[in-house]
């Protein structure tokens, strides 16, 4: 609801006054002396003045080895002020299609002056921009993904091996080699990075492959690089050309133009929908370029995310995409693909902080290449720690490159690491009832499942001290992101615990909060704390279908205080 406000002119200024702020504006081009906002009579902001910011997120971690600077978020530790410039954002029309950019040069600013009321700021941002949609339940299970030239037999055999080892999976990702990557005439057509025709050398009967994946209870997503359009060798080219009013005999490439509504309609209807009817559940949009639109100013990535997400919802089921972050408001189109990360300890050490801090923009569902993608070397300890983080991150998606030394099957890393990783992946599956309830909490109450601990404890200095500590729903997680000591075989992690008593989930040890503690953990354990009174619903069977309610539950209870938990089951 619009708050009560007073609007008047005085001393050559327009004044807008609410209970909490006083805006003064000279009604000229914005300037530091012409536009200012005073919050609660104390904090004064002038246009163009930078204030401290707790960070938000970035478009991608491509080519980032370790840490990178983050774009601003909505939260500020010192001044409690942030400003979002929304001037160049595409506007959605009443018919659901983006409107042409008007190019008036006008400024469209949103001012947030919440002080340390961090949770309220994020909740109100969701009210302004729409809540995070409800995810399909299956997205919370374990995913398998690898950039590798799989055949149908090899892929299905791998899925069967995971099942034989009682390692649950819910989503199978097929990277770009599902389609033809060697074009019939490279001089004429260019590379096969973009493609839409199944490669029969690897998938001689792709419909049967998809049917077999469904028999195994797996959802399927395929990788797309749409940039190079649809070329004459593609199976659907003649039909698409005719539907777009073009002569297929010319063999001219149909350019990919995300601003062309007619093209986009047929891109879905003619190119993608038939595959969805065959069993593809959603698409991994691997867009890495800036161009791809005939209209200046259109962010092609933003348009792709919007169009794909809306289209995937057309049959009434909960939609899903996997794509890079396209700017503030992208929380409306989950999930986020963070890009091709490096296989290094430095990359792992950055990801917990990076993931949680995105909640400062309401961006709740990052999906990382768990284990990394680029470069690297075979390191059982590194991969085990990465899997542990993945289990306690928004999306648990194992991923790797074609490098045979870095493929992420747990049994490739020795008996100790294999057993630990498989136990964690089973735990992830058992956590689905808990996480699914957190999905609803995010949707209804505006509280992301993964967020910095200072969201809940904004006035306690210790909450800002441990960058890789975060809230995982009601739990406090602090994944190990550094090597263990070669003598003790223990890894040190410093954690801040709020006031109260806490139980370490893996050891059962009880800690008194209100302080920083140094934890030392062997490879099989990571710091995970449940406050006294916490109730954690777990699926009794780790191999239960992640997409349906489990037949039986087990409850983990952290004793020492009364507690309650609202379990959501709606499938």
Where are these regions (language model features)?
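Catalytic and substrate-binding clefts that recognize carbohydrates or anionic sugar/phosphate headgroups
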Residues: 5-137, 146-147, 152-153, 157-164, ...
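Conserved, mostly hydrophobic/aromatic
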Residues: 20, 73, 162, 213, ...
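Structural recognition of the beta-strand scaffold that forms the well-ordered cores
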Residues: 74-75, 80-83, 140-143, 170-174, ...
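Flexible loop/turn segments at secondary-structure boundaries
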Residues: 81-82, 89-92, 118, 148-151, ...
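Aromatic-lined carbohydrate-binding/catalytic grooves of carbohydrate-active enzymes
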Residues: 133-292, 331
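Secondary-structure transition/capping motifs at alpha-helix termini
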Residues: 133-135, 163-171, 205-221, 273-281, ...
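Alpha-amylase-like alpha-glycosidases and glucanotransferases acting on alpha-linked glucans and related
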Residues: 245-287, 316-344, 398-421
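Catalytic core of carbohydrate-active enzymes
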Residues: 309, 329-336, 350-354, 358-368, ...
């Amino acid at each position: 609801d619009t708050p009560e406000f007073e609007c008047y002119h005085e001393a050559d200024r327009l004044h807008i006054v609410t209970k909490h702020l006083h805006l003064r504006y000279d009604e000229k081009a914005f300037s530091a002396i012409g536009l200012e906002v005073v919050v609660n009579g104390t904090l004064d902001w002038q246009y163009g003045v930078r204030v401290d910011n707790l960070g938000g997120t970035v478009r991608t971690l491509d080519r980032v080895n370790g840490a990178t600077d983050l774009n601003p978020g909505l939260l500020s530790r010192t001044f409690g002020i942030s400003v979002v410039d929304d001037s160049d954002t595409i506007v959605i029309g009443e018919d659901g299609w983006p409107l042409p950019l008007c190019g008036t040069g006008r400024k469209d600013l949103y001012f947030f002056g919440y002080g340390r009321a961090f949770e309220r700021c994020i909740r109100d941002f969701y009210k302004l921009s729409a809540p995070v949609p409800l995810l399909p339940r299956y997205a919370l299970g374990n995913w398998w993904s690898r950039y590798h030239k799989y055949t149908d037999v090899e892929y299905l055999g791998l899925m069967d091996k995971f099942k034989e080892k009682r390692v649950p999976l819910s989503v199978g990702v097929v990277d770009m080699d599902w389609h033809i990557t060697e074009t019939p005439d490279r001089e004429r057509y260019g590379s096969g990075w973009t493609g839409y025709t199944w490669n029969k050398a690897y998938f001689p009967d792709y419909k049967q492959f998809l049917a077999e994946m469904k028999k195994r209870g797996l959802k399927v997503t395929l990788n797309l690089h749409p940039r190079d359009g649809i070329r004459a060798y593609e199976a659907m080219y003649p039909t698409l050309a005719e539907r777009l009013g073009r002569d297929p005999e010319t063999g001219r490439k149909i350019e990919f133009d995300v601003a062309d509504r007619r093209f986009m309609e047929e891109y879905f209807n003619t190119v993608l929908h038939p595959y969805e009817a065959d069993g593809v559940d959603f698409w991994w949009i691997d867009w890495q370029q800036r161009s791809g639109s005939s209209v200046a100013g259109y962010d092609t990535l933003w348009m792709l995310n919007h169009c794909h997400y809306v289209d995937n919802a057309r049959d009434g089921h909960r939609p899903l995409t996997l794509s890079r972050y396209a700017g503030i408001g992208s929380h409306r189109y989950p999930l986020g693909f963070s890009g091709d990360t490096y296989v290094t300890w430095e990359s792992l050490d950055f990801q917990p902080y990076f993931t949680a801090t995105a909640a400062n923009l309401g961006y709740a569902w990052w999906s990382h290449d768990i284990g990394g993608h680029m470069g690297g070397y075979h390191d059982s300890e590194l991969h085990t720690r990465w899997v542990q983080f993945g289990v306690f991150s928004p999306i648990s998606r194992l991923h790797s490159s074609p490098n045979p030394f870095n493929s992420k099957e747990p049994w490739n890393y020795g008996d100790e690491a294999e057993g630990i990783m498989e136990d964690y992946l089973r735990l992830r599956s058992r956590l689905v009832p808990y996480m699914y309830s957190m999905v609803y909490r995010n949707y209804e109450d505006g509280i992301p499942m993964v967020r910095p601990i200072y969201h809940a404890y904004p006035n306690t200095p210790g909450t800002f001290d441990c960058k890789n500590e975060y809230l995982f729903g009601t739990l406090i997680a602090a994944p190990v992101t550094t090597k263990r000591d070669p003598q003790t075989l223990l890894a040190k992690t410093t954690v801040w615990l709020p006031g109260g008593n806490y139980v370490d989930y893996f050891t059962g040890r009880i800690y008194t909060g209100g302080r920083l503690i140094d934890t030392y953990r062997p490879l099989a354990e990571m710091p995970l704390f449940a406050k006294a009174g916490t109730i954690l619903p777990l699926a009794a069977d780790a191999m239960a279908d992640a997409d349906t309610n489990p037949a039986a539950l087990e409850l983990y209870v952290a004793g020492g205080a009364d507690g309650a938990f609202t379990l959501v089951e709606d499938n």
